[in-house]
Amino acid sequence: GSSMIGAAYSASPNFYPYDENGDYKDLRSWYSWSSHEIKNPLCMAYESTYKTVTNLTNINAALNFNPIKGLSIRTSFGLEGSDARYDGYTTKKYIYKNNTADVNHKRSTNIINEDIVTYDFSLNNIHSFNVMGGFTYQQNVYKSIAASGNTFLSDVQETNNLSSAGTANTPSTNYSKWVLMSYLGRINYSLLGRYLVTASFRADGSSRYSEGSRWGYFPSGAVAWRVSEEPFMKEFESISNMKLRVGYGKTGSTAIDPYMTQNLLTTGKTATGSENVPYYSPSSTYPEDLKWETTSQWDAGVDLGFFKQRLRITADYYYKKTTDLLNTVSLPSSSGYKSTVRNIGSISNQGVELLIEGDVVQNKDFGLTLQFNIAHNKNRVEELADGKDILGTTYSNYGSGSITIIREGEPLGAFYVYKDTGLDENGSLSYEDMNGDGQYTDTEDRYIAGSPFPDFTYGLNCGIRYKNWDFNFFLQGSQGNDVFNLSEMRNYSYGQGMNIERKVYYESWREGQDNSHAAYPKINAVGSLKYSDRFIENGSYLRLKNISLAYNLPCDKWATKNWLNGIRIFVSAQNWLTLTKYKGVDPEVSSKGSDVNAGIDHLTYPNSKTLSMGVSVKF
């Protein structure tokens, strides 16, 4: 309920949002036992404003020099700047904060320099070479300053006069900087245009990693055979392209924040006598000796073209293994820290991808193009440090503990929950006692019940052209993925005054009645609610992601001097149709936004349905 959408989900429609004086009512006051999750959504919508204005700067410059034939020297410089200001304000009528104004100004500057030398040459029109070497330097600087205050005399100035706050909070500032340096080289070789070989190597140095582990070394190579260029393929006129390829390469990830390997201090104030004295204390994140997260990948594929490229097929098989995987790990409170980032082990991904494209019909007045893709990926945790399981993010909304786990031999972030056995003779929820000790223990009575990763994903893109009309649609699908519907647990929180759906009343267990079809426990204060497979649902879906219709005006008939190149009138819609068995609002969810905690739906804001119309003019 901390977000506006969460408040709308959680507040019962039976609650009146205003008191007898016409002021916003704190919905938690209806019952003394009401959950902290319940907030007045109208108050949050009308009496709070949150605005971010971002100015972006993008500058690129390059210099090319060709001293001799085939030799190219290129140096380039790029600057990307982001200047953002966030303003948040809650009015004097807002009942959940004391009339608060927040201002946060963030500035990020990213510069990159690339110096690249390439040399192309051939021998006897048989052997062709392309040699490249270079150096890149990237630097990012981030600065922010935040200030806030509350208890203002008037709402007129909102965040534009923090000095008028009755209570001014201590301002805060933040600074970070990271640097990435790279040396790279590549050789491309072609024999008769049919046999292709590529070899490359790069060395990356990142300031984010520990002192002795800042440099990572990443080789790669690939070979390919253009079978369609062979003389014996001339008799197969329908085959316009056939290319076989295989490759191997390593890449590195810098997906950690700066200074994660250093023992940082945080600041605060404590009361000493009549004064607040500033102090320093260790950060809540324990620093580790971190090294590069590295992914090694094998790839084999084939590219096919038929009927002068009107039909194109691309198929790939890949195997990826990521070692020294970086992940946040919770620490026991006795350590004095809450968490740490650690190289926890290795995971693998292997799968196949298929892409089929076709220009089915192409003539003056009518055209039909189709594109279909399907992909299967299998994810597996190969190894963990000391072989120990790692639990995912802890939720405390309705149950207790975490919902996901990282375990050797299982998918990353698999659902790790209790096994629901239905309702007992008293109408209460019951669970399977896995180890038979008569108690429910987090570590011994839970099991892996599902995975948020799909068996396969697929998509269909269709484009139809008739004279000056264009019609396009894109279908997107996911099959076999599970969703943990944490929002559904709200329907079991009987004793907290939460918004509970009408079906609970009709489908709940009742004393003295036939309860063979009861789906919900007896309506009372439920004390045995746990994260169980009861809340795991099939998250498969097929979605009409985009559909559009456009008309191109025949400008060539009345723009005689070619000053007008085109006028296009269009209407398009996004996410207007979704077919799914998932009972929640949207099956395409991830409350925490990471692979370790993917597929958890907790009052998640759904994908927006949009309808847009416009005119595009080209001169």
Explain the meaning of each model-derived region.
Residues 61-65, 115-119, 133, 185-189, ...:
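Residues on the lipid-exposed face of transmembrane beta-strands in outer-membrane beta-barrel proteins
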Residues 182, 216-218:
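Transmembrane beta-barrel architecture of outer membranes
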Residues 451-484:
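Glycine-rich, aromatic-lined ligand/substrate-binding cores of catalytic
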Residues 65-67, 79, 121, 137, ...:
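Short beta-strand segments enriched in hydrophobic/aromatic residues
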Residues 207-212:
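Solvent-exposed loop/turn segments connecting transmembrane beta-strands
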Residues 546-579:
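C-terminal structured "cap/appendage" subdomains that terminate the fold
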Residues 197-206:
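Transmembrane beta-strand segments that form the barrel wall of outer-membrane beta-barrel proteins
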Residues 1-56, 74-181, 229-297, 308, ...:
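Surface-exposed loop/interface segments of Gram-negative outer-membrane beta-barrel transport/assembly proteins
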